[in-house]
């Protein structure tokens, strides 16, 4: 059982969970667009969801385009989050600069260095075949024996 002042007491955990749940509900309610039935009848129509009976007619283009409007948001960054984002951007810029500096030291890679693994394996196998055609099998004439376990002279 948890101690008297422990943070993990069941009562405290249950209270914290229900508190977080209610805060989440309020947060979700702020983000969703309200229906007409849940708001007063004098609420601005732009802030509520359209009714199924509302007109879906599209206005014809008459040549006068509306002025572009900037999108507004009510969500702001906390000071802590803004500092964190700025710090991460500095880290990314420093890492990119470091990569560019190391890339400058190395010469441009040639076509041989850009070969894929498959091309390298093909080249190695063909070189083995060509060496075998030139030299044939190499038999070790060692009195100690060969890898086959028999003596070859």
Curated annotation (Swiss-Prot):
Its main location: cytoplasm. Residues 31-44 have a biased composition (Low complexity). The keyword Nucleotide-binding does not apply. Pfam families: Alb1 (PF09135). Residues 1-55 are annotated as: Disordered. The keyword 4Fe-4S does not apply. It is found in: Cytoplasm; Nucleus. One of its GO terms (biological process) is ribosome biogenesis. Keywords: Cytoplasm, Nucleus, Ribosome biogenesis, Transport. GO terms for cellular component: cytoplasm; nucleus. Transmembrane segments: none annotated. It comes from the Eukaryota. Residues 10-30 have a biased composition (Basic residues). Component of the nucleoplasmic and cytoplasmic pre-60S ribosomal particles. Involved in proper assembly of pre-ribosomal particles during the biogenesis of the 60S ribosomal subunit. Accompanies the pre-60S particles to the cytoplasm. Belongs to the ALB1 family. This is Ribosome biogenesis protein ALB1. It comes from Candida albicans (strain SC5314 / ATCC MYA-2876).
């Amino acid at each position: 059982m948890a101690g008297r002042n422990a943070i993990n007491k069941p009562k405290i955990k249950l209270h914290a969970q229900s508190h977080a749940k209610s805060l989440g509900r309020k947060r979700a309610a702020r983000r969703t667009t309200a229906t007409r039935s849940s708001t007063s009848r004098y609420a601005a129509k732009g802030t509520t969801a359209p009714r199924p009976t509302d007109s879906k007619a599209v206005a014809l283009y008459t040549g006068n385009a509306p002025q572009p409007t900037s999108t507004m948001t009510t969500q702001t960054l906390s000071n802590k989050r803004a500092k964190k984002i700025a710090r991460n951007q500095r880290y990314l810029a420093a890492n990119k600069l470091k990569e560019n500096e190391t890339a400058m030291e190395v010469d441009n890679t040639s076509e041989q260095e850009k070969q894929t693994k498959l091309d390298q394996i093909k080249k190695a196998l063909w070189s083995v075949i060509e060496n075998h055609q030139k030299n044939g099998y190499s038999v070790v004439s060692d009195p100690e024996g060969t890898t086959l376990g028999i003596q070859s002279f």
